[in-house]
């Protein structure tokens, strides 16, 4: 969807060259479009079928020519075809009408549910908020998920990296966060699927409908808007789909004054698409073949994700690490922007501990005593120390057994196993599958529960009482039930 200032005067050029998704277009002298302007190619292919392709101007070449990158396939395009300069960047629909819908990079709905009702649109290329508008207070974004809030808390308006392989619960964690921000913060979420599998996008949509994150009967009650630019799309679409999702999120923050969660899956694919476009435009590659503009492209996206005095955008970004090499320029550039990392562990998932967030690998810059308070900080450190000691003792236990440990170490192991189980939690969005009602646990209740375990007050309770419960009161009640049995 594009806004049209220049359409009245019909600034029309024609295609002079097509190389894959890149095309050169010649305009009349003095009628050159600006960088980032959207161009539309309308015409018919040789079979007589209508073609409509949107491109974005990337370079001004001289001799009245521009080089543009296509946002969809260029099949059927020919030299000499007319190209219309819209006179403005790509613009996409924003507002409540986007909730419950799936869009492509152009802001066109692709869910077969008809056109979008509202008429508000915004350009995808926008400046980040001015310094004077930023909210500089360091505040925690409470998620209601114990392991996250206690050990790797999210910053309101911050950026979080989500690391994890296939099948360890990334999608369920994402859906729970979408659900909790709607219930606890009255906020909405925008999901940007950047260069990932179409099947995964479809699975996510179906799961969101099942768990009522998307309400089919009344779309306005949905909690999320979806924007997809999957891996079968041309690099131009994959490079810009993150900006489309971000623009929709900015509207909820700046106009509706809401707290917004922005999910980007996967931020590595955004860099990868930029690398492909850079090569197609003939730029000299930088380290490891990446684009020379890598840091600027990443900064342009990340600097728009922030808290203002009106609302906040908190972003959770899945990070693929190529060949597990953390020094690769793509993940290394991403790390510079992150406030916290949530690492999902296959070992914990195998034990049935969900969410399978690794308590020792996950980190946050917010876990400082002057930000979260002394009690929270001390509790988190003691929990980590206990779990770390348990990890060190596991080899000894495997070889010699528990009986060979000292009394103190046996107590540490018993408490660590309770802590490990108490870090699990039933999710609202998993109710359909587990039959257990979901639980939102406040930060105060989380700290209180872990302090009680660490102090030894609950040493007499069986460890299974702590598995998949909400607050500590539930664990005590569960222990009573187990005793009665």
UniProtKB/Swiss-Prot annotation:
List ligand-binding residues for ATP: 164-171
Principal location: plastid
Q: Where's it found, cell-wise?
A: Plastid, Chloroplast thylakoid membrane
Q: Which GO terms describe its biological process?
A: proton motive force-driven mitochondrial ATP synthesis
Please provide one cellular component term from the Gene Ontology annotations of this protein.
mitochondrion
Describe the protein's quaternary organization and the partners it interacts with.
Answer: F-type ATPases have 2 components, CF(1) - the catalytic core - and CF(0) - the membrane proton channel. CF(1) has five subunits: alpha(3), beta(3), gamma(1), delta(1), epsilon(1). CF(0) has four main subunits: a(1), b(1), b'(1) and c(9-12).
Q: What is this protein called?
A: ATP synthase subunit beta, chloroplastic
What species is given as this protein's source? Answer: Chlorokybus atmophyticus
Tell me the name of the encoding gene.
atpB
């Amino acid at each position: 969807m594009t806004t049209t200032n220049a359409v009245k005067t019909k600034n029309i050029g024609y295609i002079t060259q097509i190389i894959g998704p890149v095309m050169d277009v010649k305009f009349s002298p003095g009628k050159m479009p600006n960088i980032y302007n959207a161009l539309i190619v309308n015409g018919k292919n040789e079979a007589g079928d209508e073609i409509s392709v949107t491109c974005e101007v990337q370079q001004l070449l001289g001799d009245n020519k521009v080089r543009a990158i296509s946002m969809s396939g260029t099949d059927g395009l020919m030299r000499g075809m007319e190209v219309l300069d819209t006179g403005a960047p790509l613009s996409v629909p924003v507002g409540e009408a986007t909730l419950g819908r799936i869009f492509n990079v152009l802001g066109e709905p692709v869910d077969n549910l008809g056109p979008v009702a509202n008429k508000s649109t915004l350009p995808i290329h926008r400046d980040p908020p001015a310094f004077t508008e930023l909210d500089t207070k360091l505040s925690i974004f409470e998620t209601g998920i114990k392991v996250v809030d206690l050990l790797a808390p999210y910053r309101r308006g911050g950026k979080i990296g989500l690391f994890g392989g296939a099948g360890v619960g990334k999608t369920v964690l994402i859906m729970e966060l979408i659900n909790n921000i709607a219930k606890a913060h009255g906020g909405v979420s925008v999901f940007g699927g950047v260069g990932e599998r179409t099947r995964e996008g479809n699975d996510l949509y179906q799961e969101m409908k099942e768990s009522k994150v998307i309400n089919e009967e009344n779309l306005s009650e949905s909690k999320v808007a979806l924007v997809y630019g999957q891996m079968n799309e041309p690099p131009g679409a994959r490079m810009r789909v993150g900006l489309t999702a971000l623009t929709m999120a900015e509207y909820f923050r700046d106009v509706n004054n809401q707290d917004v969660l922005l999910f980007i899956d996967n931020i590595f694919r955004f860099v990868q698409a930029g690398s492909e476009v850079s090569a197609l435009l003939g730029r000299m590659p930088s380290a490891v073949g990446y684009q020379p503009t890598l840091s600027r492209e990443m900064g342009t996206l990340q600097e728009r994700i922030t808290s203002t005095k009106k609302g906040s955008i908190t972003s959770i970004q899945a990070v693929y690490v190529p060949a597990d090499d953390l020094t690769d320029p793509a993940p290394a550039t991403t790390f510079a922007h992150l406030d916290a990392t949530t690492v999902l562990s296959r070992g914990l998932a195998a034990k049935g501990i969900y969410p399978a967030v690794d308590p020792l690998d996950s980190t946050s810059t917010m876990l400082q005593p002057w930000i979260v308070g002394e009690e929270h900080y001390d509790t988190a450190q003691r929990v980590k120390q206990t779990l770390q000691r348990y990890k060190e003792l596991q080899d000894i236990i495997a070889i010699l057994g528990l009986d060979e440990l000292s009394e103190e170490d046996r107590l540490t192991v018993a408490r660590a196993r309770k802590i490990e189980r108490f870090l699990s939690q039933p999710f609202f969005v998993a109710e359909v599958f587990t039959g257990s009602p979901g639980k939102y646990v406040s930060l105060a209740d989380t700290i209180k529960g872990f302090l009680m375990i660490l102090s030894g007050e609950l040493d007499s309770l069986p460890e299974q009482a702590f598995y998949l419960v909400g607050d500590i009161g539930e664990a005590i009640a569960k222990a009573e039930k187990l005793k009665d049995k």
